[in-house]
Amino acid sequence: MSEEADLIARSGGGDLDAYDRLVGLYQDRVYQVAYRITGNREDAWDAAQETFLNAFRSLPRFRGASAFSTWVYRIATNAALDLIRRRPPQPPVSLEDVAVSAGDDPAETATRSELQQRLHHAITSLPADQRVVVVLRDVQGLSYEEITAVLRIPPGTVRSRLSRGRESLRRQLADLAPAAGV
């Protein structure tokens, strides 16, 4: 039995230490999914916390029909989308702050920061159905099959939403292509 499978089994039986270790394995990835969907850190932390609370409550019913990661990404996606639905639209917040070291060229740092802000704004401006698919595929690296399982939508729908989302990003970021080397 793998370490993850052991942690899942023990967590399902109420072992809080095992669940804490399981959360440690997934917390960064769950936060990233939530952040890319919600567009800000506070909502992402709220969604991540909600994800792990819901997962803990539901873990005794997890039967392994899909990978644990697929299951937890589904919970995270739902939690993030629920936050978006409940809260009024908020202005986007910049991506992770760019660390500036003494050797960094200030012009490069400013350009990199601007590129990150534009990309973040472009992603958060996508309709939620397209944003989720773009985040899961292009940011988190999930396969089409995994996205189909997470979102419970047909593969053709995944492909069309991804295509529309990418096209929208291309249009929004077209002026950056020469500067970014794309």
Model features per residue range: what roles?
Residues 23-41, 58, 123, 168, ...:
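Amphipathic, Lys/Arg- and hydrophobic-enriched alpha-helical face
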